[in-house]
Amino acid sequence: LLHCAEAQKTYSDLLLKQIPENAKSILDVGSGSGNTAKKLIDRGNIVECISPSSFLSEEIEKKLGSMVTIYKTLFEKLETDNTYDLILFSESFQYVPIKKSLEKCYKLLNSNGYILICDFFQKDPSHFTELRGGHSFPRFQNVIQSLKFKEISNIDVTEQTAPTIQILDDFLTQFGGPLKSLTNFYLENRYPMFSKLLKWKYRKRIKKLNRIYFSGQLTAQEFMEQKTYRFMLYQKQ
């Protein structure tokens, strides 16, 4: 857990360093619980958040109150007359459609505004991997190059990010596995009929979860082979 906290701090510090000084108004897409938004506000930025999750929106409101405007919607469904100096996707770009979202960014950005994308992508989407998630990086590059955006920086942090995946795998192996076995033992002994029905109904999902999270395949090496993690800054032209 200590390593995870250190990794999160390193991530946040690098993210903040990528934001140009002249970018004052920021739209934070997929704001989580509002930690990044708080750091941005603390350094003097004007921040608006997009959070389709009611639970997370409430967490942001508790943390930031009237200091931030929250849009409880998906980015592609956002309706606003406001424009921004920078639109931030911190591990949220993988959840939005590429072309539609980039075109929307262009409309929402002020003249010479920026997009900052911090996320992982698939190197080769045709190659099957249990490590799902992330858009095709070749497709993303093709789309953004077809639009009026100039690449300012493109930092590959895949190698630095991979150890976090290994920490997760170690945690699941050392703690998740035994906890899963203990839960199974409890259910089978206390509620045998319910346990059998549960395993039958969700047998495919359980098999998939075991294959992904408890097979030892969720490794740093696998991540580096299949994914590329980028901090990318683009400017509207």
Task: Give each language-model segment a name.
Residues 77-87:
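A short acidic, Gly/Pro-enriched loop at the edge of an enzyme's catalytic core
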Residues 86-98:
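A short SAM/SAH-binding and catalytic strip from SAM-dependent methyltransferases
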Residues 5-22:
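Conserved alpha-helix/loop element of class I SAM-dependent methyltransferases that forms part
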Residues 27-77:
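Class I SAM-dependent methyltransferase SAM/SAH-binding core
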Residues 128-218:
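Substrate-binding/catalytic lobe of Class I Rossmann-like enzymes that use SAM or dcSAM, i.e.
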Residues 170-180, 224-237:
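Core SAM-dependent methyltransferase catalytic element
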Residues 99-114:
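A short glycine-rich, Lys/Arg-flanked "PGG" loop and its adjoining helix->strand segment in the class I
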